[in-house]
Structure formats: structure tokens, C-alpha cells
Amino acid sequence: MNAPLAGIWPWLPLLWAWLVPEVSSSWWYMRATGTSRVMCDNVPGLVSRQRQLCHRHPDVMRAIGLGVAEWTAECQHQFRQHRWNCDTLDRDHSLFGRLLLRSSRESAFVYAISSAGVVFAITRACSQGELKSCSCDPKKKGTAKDSRGTFDWGGCSDNIDYGVKFARAFVDAKEKKGKDARALMNLHNNRAGRKAVKRFLKQECKCHGVSGSCTLRTCWLAMADFRKTGDYLWRKYNGAIQVVMNQDGTGFTVANKRFKKPTKNDLVYFENSPDYCIRDRDAGSPGTAGRVCNLTSRGMDSCEVMCCGRGYDTSRVTRMTKCECKFHWCCAVRCQDCLEALDVHTCKAPKSADWAVPT
């Protein structure tokens, strides 16, 4: 290695953290890190409280890191038909680039779904016996009653209270150090995400008795599939409430007095979103050039909306598909592999070449 570069190399993580605009949730970068000590010391932007928790609970950090892929995939599912599709940047420690420097509705959703993802990942790891600091919910013991009568707590109830508590301590740590509008917004949306997971905690039971008479029941609490949380937060995104800081700077109020004050379950934002039509570094917009659009749709994924009126290119592609499926007794369905030709429509690039500049 070149001698001058050899001297600089040990300082690159610090240099990177200094050069990149500060984004609150640098812990998202944990999905790409290695061992716990390397992760705790080199993830840019972690505050001291987050590093303390990271060193103290390496097994929890592994669960959080694995969970990043899950909630980013859910974000991409929810936005799959929109101009901004929750695409991540592998070489950016914020995952989403400058998008999160804006206090937009999209930023609100990302903070909420990521906070929810941490709760879900930690709680699941607790129930699976992967964490030293928690296990199944210790409070769910003995006998209890519901609308169907008496039952015994059994099995392994998901310890969601631990997941919520740890997620709040870790995720909110950096926001609590700031008193600005963005910090307050992020804290609110983080909490909304945590509450969303808990909202879908459901009681599951197993019956015991002769011929399934259910004379005895054993029950436990279980989290629903994360898709339910994603769908719920998506509805909250569509109904997100624009707010402004109050006069003393300790909270916010609705920007439009015709709207009700946001509840703890609502998502809030300060800034209007860009249209995401063209690549814009400052707005965190990747643009829609090259995105696949639906020629027959009238929704957000239509070629007219997705391509922002620029038009689209059409290419003929072939794909392998199942065909001539037949049911065979008993009990299988057998199909042939067939080649299918179809048209794929992709959005044209703007006439200006600026869109092609990499972010």
C-alpha cells in the first residue's frame, strides 16, 4: 500500500463519519457490519449510549442487524408502486441517503417502520432463546380469564415489553440528545412504530379435552406477521399529519387548523415531499428513469404517473412460466415449463443528462 495511504487508513471510519451529512439513525448501517466490537466501534454516528448498549448486548445487536433487512424489505413492499420505492444505498451509512435530511412523509414512515422492526426483531429473538437478557414473557403465568372463560397461560408468550423497552432506549438515544424539530418528529414517529407492533399482539390458544371439547385451554401471546404492522403504518403514512413547532419549541401543532391534533399512533411530518420524478441529490430522490411501469393501470404505478409524463420505452422479454397444469390423483398438480413473451414498459429518462449523475 502507498505509504501516505497506509497512515490514513486507520482513520477512514472517522473521516467517513465527518464527511457524510449527519443522519440520526446511523444504526441502520449495522446490517453490513461484522463482529460486535467492530460494529460497535465503527458504525458512524452512534452516540455514547448506543455504543454502551451495543458493547453490553452484542446478541441483541445481532438481532437488530438481521432485522434491518426485514423492515427495509417491508418498506420496499409498501412503496413498490410509487415513484419513491424505499430503495437503499449500499454504500451509505444512512441507507437512504439525503432523503432523511428532509422531514417528509417518507422520512416519517422510514423512522416508524425501522423502530417497529427493532421491536419485532428483539421480541422474536427473545422467544427463540437467542438473547441472554430476556426470554418468554415472565408475567404470563398461572390462570387468567377472557370472554370464553378461564384458561392457563402456557407455551411461550412473546416478551414484547422487553422489545419495546430496549428499542426505545437504543433507537431514541440520539434523538433525545437533540431538541430541534426533526428530533421531536423522529421521536414521535419512532413511538408510533413501536406501538404498531404491540397493536397486533394476539392471543393464541390450544384446546385440551375429549374429542376437542376444549374443557381446558392453554394460551399464549404472539406477535402477528410483520406485514400487518407494515400495512397499518402504510395507512398511517397516507393519513400522515403535517405539523409545525409550537411557540416555545417543546412540541408541535397541526399546520392546518382544520385537522385534528395527531395522536400517538399517527405519523407526523414538517416538509412537503418532492415529486421524486428526477434524480435530485438534495431531495434524496433517485428519480424514476428506468423504473418499470404498468401500461393498463390508473394508479400510482401507471406509466403516466410513474414516468411523470415523460413517456416510456417498451421491450419484448421472455420468461419461464408454469403452464398446462393438470391435477393427478392423488394428490399433486403437475405443470409444464413454458416460455412466455411479454412487453415490459420502463420510464424514459429526462432529456437533460443531469439525471445520470450518480448520487
Curated annotation (Swiss-Prot):
Among CDD domains, the record links this protein to: Wnt_Wnt2
Q: Which UniProt keywords apply?
A: Developmental protein, Disulfide bond, Extracellular matrix, Glycoprotein, Lipoprotein, Secreted, Signal, Wnt signaling pathway
Q: GO cellular component annotations, sorted alphabetically?
A: extracellular space
Cross-referenced InterPro entries, in alphabetical order?
Wnt, Wnt2, Wnt_C, Wnt_CS
Pfam families, A to Z: wnt
One GO BP: animal organ development
Bridged cysteine pairs (disulfide):
75-86, 126-134, 136-156, 205-219, 207-214, 277-308, 293-303, 307-347, 323-338, 325-335, 330-331
Primary location recorded for the protein, binned into one broad class: secreted
Gene3D superfamilies recorded = 3.30.2460.20
| An example molecular function term from Gene Ontology annotations | cytokine activity
- Subcellular compartments: Secreted, Extracellular space, Extracellular matrix
Lipid moiety-binding region (O-palmitoleoyl serine): 211
Protein task: Ligand for members of the frizzled family of seven transmembrane receptors. Probable developmental protein. May be a signaling molecule which affects the development of discrete regions of tissues. Is likely to signal over only few cell diameters.
Q: Which family does it belong to?
A: Belongs to the Wnt family.
Question: By what name is this protein known?
Answer: Protein Wnt-2
Say which species the protein is native to: Echinops telfairi
